[in-house]
């Protein structure tokens, strides 16, 4: 990979120096999760080939899968037409992206009667993932 970081200057970072990131499973097109990256996280993600996010609550870099083993191997990075959203196509190791033990964080579906319904099963109990 190139050691140049000029490409990072093309990203439109928000007022907090962050960019929203959508993680999409490369093989299925499933949207797995939404998170944030700062400049260092995006650069290190590109360099290592593993997803590294910025945790807004903990105010530190977060290596996806560092506790669970459910790492995301980056297949492709894209940026939208306004350069302010990153799409990251990934291979989701272990098939679980969500801390709830589900494949995707988007496991609730809106129904016409005004309710949210859980439509994806828990694949592994979070207590077994994070113990």
From Swiss-Prot:
Pfam families found in the cross-reference section: PRA-CH
First-level EC class: hydrolase
Superkingdom of the organism of origin: Bacteria
GO cellular component, one term: cytoplasm
Positions with a binding annotation for Zn(2+): 81, 98, 105
Main location: cytoplasm
Cofactors required: Mg(2+); Zn(2+)
RNA-binding keyword on record: no
Name recorded for this polypeptide: Phosphoribosyl-AMP cyclohydrolase
Name of the gene encoding the protein in the UniProt record: hisI
């Amino acid at each position: 990979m190139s050691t140049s970081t000029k490409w990072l200057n093309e990203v439109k970072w928000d007022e907090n120096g962050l960019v929203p990131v959508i993680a999409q499973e490369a093989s299925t097109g499933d949207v797995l999760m939404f998170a944030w990256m700062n400049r260092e996280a995006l650069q290190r993600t590109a360099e290592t080939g593993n997803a590294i996010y910025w945790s807004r609550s903990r105010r530190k870099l977060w290596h996806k899968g560092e506790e669970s083993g459910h790492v995301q191997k980056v297949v492709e990075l894209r940026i939208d037409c306004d350069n302010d959203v990153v799409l990251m196509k990934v291979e989701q190791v272990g098939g679980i992206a969500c801390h709830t033990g589900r494949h995707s964080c988007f496991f609730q579906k809106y129904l016409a009667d005004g309710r949210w319904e859980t439509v994806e099963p828990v694949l592994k109990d979070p207590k077994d993932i994070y113990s």
